[in-house]
C-alpha cells in the first residue's frame, strides 16, 4: 500500500508540472487575450475617460462598483442591439429600392490606375514566361514597335562605308556603274558596224532599224571597234536627219 501511494505521488509530482506548462498556461493565455479582444470596445472609452480598464474594475470592485459595471454592460448590450436593428431596417429598405429601381452600371475610372500600367505589363510578361517555361515551350520574342522610316539606314551605302579604304568617290563610281554601262569621251566619233559576225539577214522589204539594240546582240560589243555608249546613240538619234539615215542604210547594205 505504501508503494502504491508513493508511486501515485511520484506520478502526480511529475505530471502536474507538465500539465501546468503544456496545457494550463497556454489555455489561460488564450482565454485572457480573447477576453481582452472582446472587451476592447469597452476598454477604449474606459481608458480615455476614466484612466482604467475593465479588468481593474472587476478585480477592485465592491458591491457598489459591481452595480456600476453591470449597468455599463447593460447599456453596451442595448446600444449594440439597437444599432443592429437599425442596420437591418435600412438594409432591407435599400434592397427593396434597388429591386424596384435598377441601378445603372456606371463606374468611376480612377486616374491612379494608369500609374500601375507598366507594372501590370511587366507582371503579365513575367507570368507568361513562367507558364511557358513550366510547360516546356519556347518563349516567343517580345514584339517590338516598327522603326520610324527616318531611322532606316541604307544597307548598301553602310556596307561600302564599313569597308576599309572606301570613300565617297568609290561609292559614287560604283553606284553610277549601274546607271551608265560605259563611259566614253564626248568627242568620240561614231563608228559604223562593219563586222562580219553580225548575222543581219534582212531584205529590202523588211523594216530596217539603224539603231542597234543592246538586248538583241549578246556579243556585239565585245571588241573596242564596236563599242559605243548609250548616251552617244541617244544624241545621234536626236540629231540625225533623214539624209543621214538614208546614207547609213546605203553603207550598211554595201558592207554586206
UniProtKB/Swiss-Prot annotation:
The modification Phosphoserine is found at residue 241. The chain crosses the membrane at residues 1-21, 22-42, 76-96. GO terms for cellular component: endoplasmic reticulum membrane; lipid droplet; mitochondrion; nuclear inner membrane. Residues 43-75 are extracellular. The keyword Phosphoprotein applies. It comes from the Eukaryota. The keyword Methyltransferase does not apply. One of its GO terms (biological process) is negative regulation of sphingolipid biosynthetic process. The modification Phosphothreonine is found at residues 180, 184. It is a multi-pass membrane protein. Keywords: Lipid droplet, Membrane, Phosphoprotein, Transmembrane, Transmembrane helix. Its main location: membrane. Residues 97-256 are cytoplasmic. It is found in: Membrane; Lipid droplet. Present with 149 molecules/cell in log phase SD medium. May be involved in protein-linked oligosaccharide phosphorylation since the deletion reduces the negative charge of the cell surface. This is Protein LDB16. It comes from Saccharomyces cerevisiae (strain ATCC 204508 / S288c) (Baker's yeast). The gene is LDB16.
Amino acid at each position: 500500500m505504501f508503494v502504491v501511494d508513493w508511486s501515485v505521488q511520484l506520478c502526480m509530482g511529475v505530471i502536474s508540472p507538465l500539465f501546468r506548462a503544456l496545457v494550463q498556461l497556454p489555455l489561460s493565455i488564450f482565454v485572457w487575450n480573447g477576453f481582452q479582444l472582446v472587451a476592447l470596445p469597452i476598454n477604449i472609452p474606459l481608458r480615455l475617460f476614466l484612466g482604467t480598464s475593465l479588468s481593474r474594475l472587476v478585480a477592485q470592485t465592491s458591491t457598489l462598483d459591481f452595480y456600476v459595471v453591470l449597468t455599463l454592460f447593460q447599456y453596451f448590450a442595448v446600444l449594440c442591439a439597437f444599432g443592429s436593428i437599425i442596420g437591418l431596417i435600412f438594409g432591407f429598405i435599400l434592397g427593396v429600392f434597388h429591386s424596384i429601381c435598377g441601378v445603372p452600371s456606371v463606374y468611376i475610372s480612377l486616374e491612379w490606375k494608369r500609374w500601375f500600367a507598366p507594372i501590370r505589363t511587366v507582371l503579365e510578361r513575367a507570368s507568361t514566361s513562367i507558364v511557358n517555361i513550366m510547360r516546356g515551350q519556347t518563349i516567343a520574342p517580345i514584339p517590338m514597335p516598327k522603326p520610324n522610316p527616318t531611322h532606316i539606314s541604307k544597307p548598301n551605302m553602310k556596307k561600302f562605308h564599313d569597308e576599309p579604304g572606301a570613300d565617297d568617290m568609290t561609292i559614287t563610281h560604283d553606284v553610277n556603274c549601274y546607271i551608265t554601262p560605259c563611259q566614253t569621251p564626248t568627242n568620240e566619233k561614231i563608228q559604223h558596224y562593219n563586222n562580219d559576225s553580225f548575222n543581219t539577214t534582212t531584205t529590202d522589204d523588211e523594216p530596217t532599224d539603224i539603231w542597234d539594240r543592246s538586248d538583241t546582240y549578246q556579243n556585239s560589243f565585245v571588241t573596242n571597234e564596236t563599242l559605243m555608249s548609250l548616251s552617244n546613240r541617244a544624241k545621234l538619234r536626236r540629231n540625225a536627219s533623214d539624209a543621214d539615215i538614208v546614207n547609213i542604210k546605203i553603207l550598211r547594205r554595201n558592207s554586206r
